[in-house]
Amino acid sequence: MSKVASIVDVLQGKVAIGETVTVRGWVRTRRDSKAGLSFLAVYDGSCFDPIQAIINNDIENYESEILRLTTGCSVIVTGKVVESPAEGQAVELQAEKVEVTGFVEDPDTYPMAAKRHSIEYLREVAHLRPRTNIIGAVARVRHCLSQAIHRFFHEQGFYWVATPLITASDTEGAGEMFRVSTLDLENLPRSENGKVDFSQDFFGKESFLTVSGQLNGETYACALSKIYTFGPTFRAENSNTTRHLAEFWMVEPEVAFATLADNAKLAEDMLKYVFRAVLAERKDDLQFFEKHVDKDVITRLENFVNSDFAQIDYTDAIDVLLKSGKKFEFPVSWGIDLSSEHERFLAEEYFKSPVVVKNYPKDIKAFYMRLNDDEKTVAAMDVLAPGIGEIIGGSQREERLEVLDKRMEEMGLNPDDYWWYRDLRKYGSVPHSGFGLGFERLIVYVTGVQNIRDVIPFPRAPRNANF
């Protein structure tokens, strides 16, 4: 019995020329020659390229099955690895046996037929779109990036912490949260003042899907020193744009005793590490994106890993924007939250490199960010990347209880709701810092795929929760 191998192993020469091997996958294309040969391009998802299998018409099921094969049919091909005379790949399979495990019922109506489909159409058939070149490549890049992130933090001595998806806290203080409830919507319990009585709900209080694992992560950082979370987060933000998802993944490290400068260095080291990994490990997929999606994909990543990060205070960044002579869609003044056009001008035109903007006005940032001595700004930072703008947001956290309480009061938050978070400041408080990286935004940056809904397997967005 021949050994089973992945197509990537065969194409990379891990199976010797002349050896008999079995590959299992799906037909991308079939073409027939007048000489009584059929050529199957078979893929199994292990790499971008399919392998070519050459089938003689003397194979017993040639007439009955091989000539009926169409795009999407599943096959098990056993054959000898031979050198390929054709350009494009070094080896091919001289088939000795082809077992058809599944035909496509009606090739004419198969949604993934060989013709090229628009990315918008593929969203409507998200259960089948992994079979396409583009979504298969995105999936492999996504895997590579996630593994590189875990590897980076492991090598740096971090511990991964599983923070809860159901929470009673609003980390961002923005209120755009999905409520979790088992109450009967047709018969809601009411308190004396007429409001919904959540004490009768499953958790005995109002509960939500998390918008961030940060606050929970801080509790572990204040015991294990260096932790990170990596998991799904949820925002009930009614934004139907190419940049927003209702469910997305976040990477959130948190480090005890770390300053804002330490935080910026960690962000730079992590991004460069994962970009080097994807350049080394997913070259075939990146070349596809370079050819068909964004010609600057590889150059952009190479420039990024070879760039020193610029740093600028928010106040100085506002001056740069005001003096640029450029007419922005959103007017520039001290106190605004930088828009994407401002961020991209700084990274792409002014610095021409990744840039860390730090020390933002306190009124546009979250309650947990450390108040600076000027009492107008907080020790917050954003990493801006050429080609996309903000890719990471973080801060040094407020470790002084009285300052934290005052900030919560200013923002209309009830300290009692955050009693456990305040406890961290009562019992051995330490300066600490962390940041958040939207994982899908990272994939958009790496692949050049413009719509964030195309880099997550099953996108969740306003009025869209199919599959």
From Swiss-Prot:
SUPFAM superfamilies: Class II aaRS and biotin synthetases (SSF55681), Nucleic acid-binding proteins (SSF50249). Its main location: cytoplasm. Pfam families: tRNA-synt_2, tRNA_anti-codon. One of its GO terms (molecular function) is ATP binding. Its EC number is 6.1.1.22. The keyword Ligase applies. It is found in: Cytoplasm. It catalyses: tRNA(Asn) + L-asparagine + ATP = L-asparaginyl-tRNA(Asn) + AMP + diphosphate + H(+). GO terms for cellular component: cytoplasm. Keywords: Aminoacyl-tRNA synthetase, ATP-binding, Cytoplasm, Ligase, Nucleotide-binding, Protein biosynthesis. GO terms for biological process: asparaginyl-tRNA aminoacylation. Homodimer. Belongs to the class-II aminoacyl-tRNA synthetase family. This is Asparagine--tRNA ligase. It comes from Haemophilus influenzae (strain ATCC 51907 / DSM 11121 / KW20 / Rd).
